[in-house]
């Protein structure tokens, strides 16, 4: 079983995912008129399922983003790049969104939330038991492989992995634990843009 728990709402969510998948597969298999929503859904699904094309493309689809990231030479260039990447759903250090004010649901606020750690929980970076260390080592191997797939040789990929782990570990140390994240009062720090 892949779930730590599986209640009635989880079952509903899983059934919903399966129904949506069935709809998408049916749409993608059909003949859809050019420019229709069905054609767009089918195209994106078929593209995502075409592993031969994806492997042949390599990093080409994200090459422009990689070049922008590589071109950053000064800290002042990071925030504008983060804003640009956010348009593609990439939030490197923290996430932000507009949502209801938890103290006044009639009001929406621009909200920031911790992020920047790929392993999900801060303990994966900070704990040193055998299981956690093994997970962290596998993650390091994954980072090296991703950099190699992006065109870096093994030595450069390992150096970049060390930089990634250093940054993510520092972010993890500054992050709230899962328990702290569940405390609404500890996570509510309403302020103006000037105060931010």
Show where each model-derived region lies.
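Zn2+-dependent metallopeptidase catalytic domains
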Residues: 1-196
């Amino acid at each position: 079983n892949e779930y730590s728990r599986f209640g009635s709402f989880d079952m509903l969510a899983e059934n919903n995912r399966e129904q949506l998948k069935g709809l998408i597969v049916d749409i993608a298999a059909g003949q859809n008129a050019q420019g229709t929503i069905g054609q767009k859904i089918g195209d994106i699904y078929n593209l995502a399922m075409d592993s031969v094309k994806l492997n042949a493309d390599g990093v080409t689809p994200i090459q422009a983003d990689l070049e922008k990231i590589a071109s950053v030479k000064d800290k002042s260039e990071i925030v504008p790049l983060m804003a640009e990447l956010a348009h593609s759903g990439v939030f490197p250090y923290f996430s932000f969104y507009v949502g209801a004010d938890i103290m006044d649901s009639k009001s929406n606020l621009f909200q920031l939330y911790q992020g920047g750690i790929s392993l999900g929980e801060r303990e994966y970076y900070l704990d040193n038991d055998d299981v956690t260390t093994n997970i962290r080592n596998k993650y390091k191997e994954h980072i090296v492989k991703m950099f190699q797939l992006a065109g870096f040789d093994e030595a450069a990929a390992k150096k970049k992995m060390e930089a990634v782990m250093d940054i993510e570990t520092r972010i993890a140390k500054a992050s709230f634990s899962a328990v702290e994240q569940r405390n609404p009062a500890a996570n509510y720090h309403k302020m103006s843009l000037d105060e931010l």
